[in-house]
Amino acid sequence: MKFYKYCASGNDFVIFADSEKKDRSELAKILCNRYEGIGADGLIVIVPHDRYDFEWEFYNCDGSKANMCGNGSRAAAHFAHHHLKKSQYLNFLTGAGLIKSFVDDDIVEIKLSGIKDIKEAFEYKDRIWQGCNTGVPHIVTFVDDLSEFDINLCKEVRKKYNANVNFAKVEDDEFIRVRTYERGVEDETLACGTGMGACFYLAYLNQKVKDDILIKPKSNESLYFRLEEEQIFFRGKVKCCFEADYNFT
């Protein structure tokens, strides 16, 4: 079967299309292994849907399923448009709900599913944290210096609150830098779309930024976020790195 290796702002994915849904947890662990497989943060499988352009199955590299992945959804839209010959304007179903996207060559913009479960700020380990769900749960702490990012603290917070963990530095009211520890990967990743979305929304909610800003994750790639009627849109580059055949048996 043919698969495609994708990169989107620092996150990488293995993507292929199939005719039916089924459990691919073990396959995800094999394909995403960076030493014995292809290597990726996640596996995306595109399957048909009778109402929308397609539906996806998303697996983290540890084989666990995730309802949503922001950069993964941009990669999926790029794949569907360029390789499955779908429209530039796409509606597709994820575990977090309907995602709308627009593909313009290698720039892809998506509208995240609605923001929910907004938490009151709280203190933990001498830091102020706040959480929300932008498709998957995130916890955010705003810092003066991103070198304060503490991988051991992230592991502790992730386990305690069962959420992705983000450290965010507001450079000015139009620019944020973000570092993210992701569930399922169980490590810091080069980027996380839903994590950046959570940082953007909580910064906006606390009057730290405007409603249209630039965010740079650890990969240092530029992503642009805007808020319209309580909906988060974000766009950035997507790259198909290569395609190849793989024996999935």
UniProtKB/Swiss-Prot annotation:
Gene3D superfamilies in the record: Diaminopimelate Epimerase, Chain A, domain 1
Assembly description: Homodimer.
GO CC, alphabetical: cytosol
Record EC number: 5.1.1.7
Binding site for substrate: 11, 60, 70-71, 164, 182-183, 193-194
GO annotation terms (biological process): lysine biosynthetic process via diaminopimelate
EC main group: isomerase
UniProt pathway: Amino-acid biosynthesis; L-lysine biosynthesis via DAP pathway; DL-2,6-diaminopimelate from LL-2,6-diaminopimelate: step 1/1
Pfam family, one: DAP_epimerase
Record keywords: Amino-acid biosynthesis, Cytoplasm, Isomerase, Lysine biosynthesis
Molecular-function GO term, any one: diaminopimelate epimerase activity
Gene name of the record: dapF
InterPro entries, per the entry: DAP_epimerase_AS, DAP_epimerase_DapF
Protein name as catalogued: Diaminopimelate epimerase
HAMAP family linked: DAP_epimerase
Family, as annotated: Belongs to the diaminopimelate epimerase family.
Catalysed reactions, semicolon-separated: (2S,6S)-2,6-diaminopimelate = meso-2,6-diaminopimelate
Membrane-spanning residues: none
Active site: 69, 192
Entry keyword annotation includes Endoplasmic reticulum: no
Stated role: Catalyzes the stereoinversion of LL-2,6-diaminopimelate (L,L-DAP) to meso-diaminopimelate (meso-DAP), a precursor of L-lysine and an essential component of the bacterial peptidoglycan.
SUPFAM superfamilies noted in UniProt: Diaminopimelate epimerase-like
Site for Could be important to modulate the pK values of the two catalytic cysteine residues, residues: 138, 182
Signal peptide as annotated in the record: none
